[in-house]
From Swiss-Prot:
Keyword Membrane: no
Name of the protein this chain belongs to: Pentatricopeptide repeat-containing protein At4g17616
Source species of the chain: Arabidopsis thaliana (Mouse-ear cress)
UniProt entry keywords in alphabetical sequence: Repeat
Renumbered ranges of PPR repeats: 409-443, 444-478, 519-553, 554-584, 593-627
Record Gene3D superfamilies: Tetratricopeptide repeat domain
Family: Belongs to the PPR family. P subfamily.
Amino acid sequence: MFRKRNLVLESFRRFDSGNVETLISWVLCSRTSKPSLFCTSVKPARLNWEVSSQVILKKKLETALKDHRVDDAWDVFKDFKRLYGFPESVIMNRFVTVLSYSSDAGWLCKASDLTRLALKQNPGMLSGDVLTKLSLSLARAQMVESACSILRIMLEKGYVLTSDVLRLVVMHMVKTEIGTCLASNYLVQVCDRFVEFNVGKRNSSPGNVVKPDTVLFNLVLGSCVRFGFSLKGQELIELMAKVDVVADAYSIVIMSCIYEMNGMRDELRKFKEHIGQVPPQLLGHYQHFFDNLLSLEFKFDDIGSAGRLALDMCKSKVLVSVENLGFDSEKPRVLPVGSHHIRSGLKIHISPKLLQRDSSLGVDTEATFVNYSNSKLGITNKTLAKLVYGYKRHDNLPELSKLLFSLGGSRLCADVIDACVAIGWLEAAHDILDDMNSAGYPMELATYRMVLSGYYKSKMLRNAEVLLKQMTKAGLITDPSNEIVVSPETEEKDSENTELRDLLVQEINAGKQMKAPSMLYELNSSLYYFCKAKMQGDALITYRKIPKMKIPPTVQSFWILIDMYSSLGMYREITIVWGDIKRNIASKNLKTTQDLLEKLVVNFLRGGYFERVMELISYMKENDMYNDLTMYKNEYLKLHKNLYRTLKASDAVTEAQAQRLEHVKTFRKLVGIV
């Protein structure tokens, strides 16, 4: 009693005398309404400190909050909580709201900590609106961990968060790499809860869950592309199909980026035929889609397909008419995720003409292979260089000649011939000349002279004689002896198309460097099909082909295999995959990613391999990768809530049990489970 009295007196001293007199008068005047607070006898009145101090502190807190005096409110709140615990729900809601409106990170941090503590003691103390305001304020301040923590609390309690507000919170979160990691994991959690509540129809669900919308997925998928979380992006695409969210035009382009990063050409090819006869204003929007598809054709070293795609784009044949596709252009179209031969596979709905007006999304990178001007798609010099290099490497120059003429006529052929001469590919340049002449489209004299000049410079006199005869036969010249070796005209033309020449040199040098072979992309595609079909035997045979061919696996190879084992609950097999990953890391053949390691952690938690869990968490810390401890904690509580909770080290029978017990306790301590 004496201690509480001193605290109240100290609180009085923080206010001026006028305020104190006012408060005392207010308390004394309340005798009529609250007679129990004071003695009604004729003896001198004695203040009941136990009751009156609580009333006074409560009034002071309300006044400070009303006047937005955050410092005073915090001091009074601390005194109140020390004496009486948390104030009533109305005051707490007001207090957290006032703190949420602060632009100071310190007050926002206190609001977040206070909220978690209050909800731990009384789960219903704070309203959903207050938690929503707090999460938005935290996200704006880039306190993404705290913001995500509040979002997860609301999800667990069944508070419905409107789509507009959730978009705002997530939009601020995904501005950073850690925020993207948290937002993607939260979106996975929302989708899982939505499927559980709406498909499982469980009565124990805490409340309804709003279905994530297209814009929310686009925000998170776009940030996955921006920060390189392509594997997490792939998981979200499959979740998009699982919860039946329609992919709009933005979604398709963002998904194309993820498929390109993961080397999934077959998945991206499915979209091409469904884009349909889009309006001219949308053609530019799909520039990155075709850029990514063309990139994959080059990665697979499928030069023929790359050439046909380039020709289709330039001739606008890629945009198949809607009538030929046999469906209404306004209705969402259905695509299989994985092979269409898998009957039980997921299917995603797409609407290529739909653009969300409130979506400030898109791909913020420049297209490499496709340009867009005058309402038309075209290819860049980078694409042209890759096509020329690819066709020559595959010894298929006649097809190259046909493609060049179809793309740009004689002018483009002349540019390519000039570039070939500049880098010393004289015979290739001569072959293109012959092909064009055979097709009935002979080149101009200046182009012939360019090749002839190259022959003379390289001392290839026999080839020069052959070319002179051809020029004479074609009627381009009458006297071969009058042809000078190098004329000012040819010297000037040598420097005209330097960009194409330089890009060809880059392609030649890049071809000499060690890269992921095209065969690896083919094997990964087969592996993806077998894993989605749950064909373990064929999947393992395909996976084992990779090291046998002396090709180092990619993170996509491991992700695909882990995803299959995870869907089958075969966690022991995932430990074997982790061993393969470590061997490839040690041999410097593999650079792991945060999303791959995080997937391993979650699966080892599900399987109860806590030694592997701690090993991975330590490895991620050493390599400056973010660990979503709250997600780990939630995963643990779903499956192992009471595991070894009361056991001691002395209770272990074997050394293995003792070690397992120690790993579990270490994990519980790390994620904050007491």
